[in-house]
A protein has these predicted regions:
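Alpha-helix C-caps/helix-loop-beta hinges
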Residues: 18, 55-56
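Residue-level marker of regulatory loop/turn positions in helix-turn-helix DNA-binding domains and
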Residues: 3-4, 75
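Short, positively charged loop/turn segments that connect secondary-structure elements
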Residues: 31-47
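Alpha-helical residues within the helix-turn-helix
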Residues: 28, 54
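Short, leucine-enriched amphipathic alpha-helices that occur as contiguous helical runs
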Residues: 4-12
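Phospho-regulated, low-complexity intrinsically disordered regions of nuclear gene-regulatory
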Residues: 44, 55, 61-98
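Short capping segments at the starts of secondary-structure elements
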Residues: 16-25
Length: 98
């Protein structure tokens, strides 16, 4: 559970299992935990994921167009995995020792 942990820390924590996740899977989990159920909340969380990827903590491993409207119809979906750098930063933030 998230508690009062900053959202980006929680996102990293979800990825620490080493599995690949689509952005919409992480977004929906964070929306539920932080009660951010608006379109603004959804897009804000997605932007946090993009920032973590641009900072080298997550790696974009697959993309596809959201034809079914799972996240936002006709938008690009991304699948991410945590990097070694992300694991180290997560450990530094005391999320979990890896």
């Amino acid at each position: 559970m998230s508690g009062n942990r900053p959202i980006k820390f929680r996102i990293l924590e979800l990825f620490l299992d080493g599995k690949e996740y689509w952005n919409y899977e992480i977004v929906s989990k964070i929306q539920e935990e932080y009660n951010m159920n608006s379109a603004y909340g959804r897009d804000s969380i997605n932007f946090d994921i993009i920032e973590l990827a641009s900072g080298g903590m997550l790696k974009d491993v697959e993309q596809k167009v959201d034809e079914a409207g799972i996240y936002k119809k006709d938008f690009l979906l991304h699948k991410y995995v945590i990097t070694d750098f992300g694991k180290a930063r997560g450990s530094d933030a005391c999320l979990r020792y890896v």
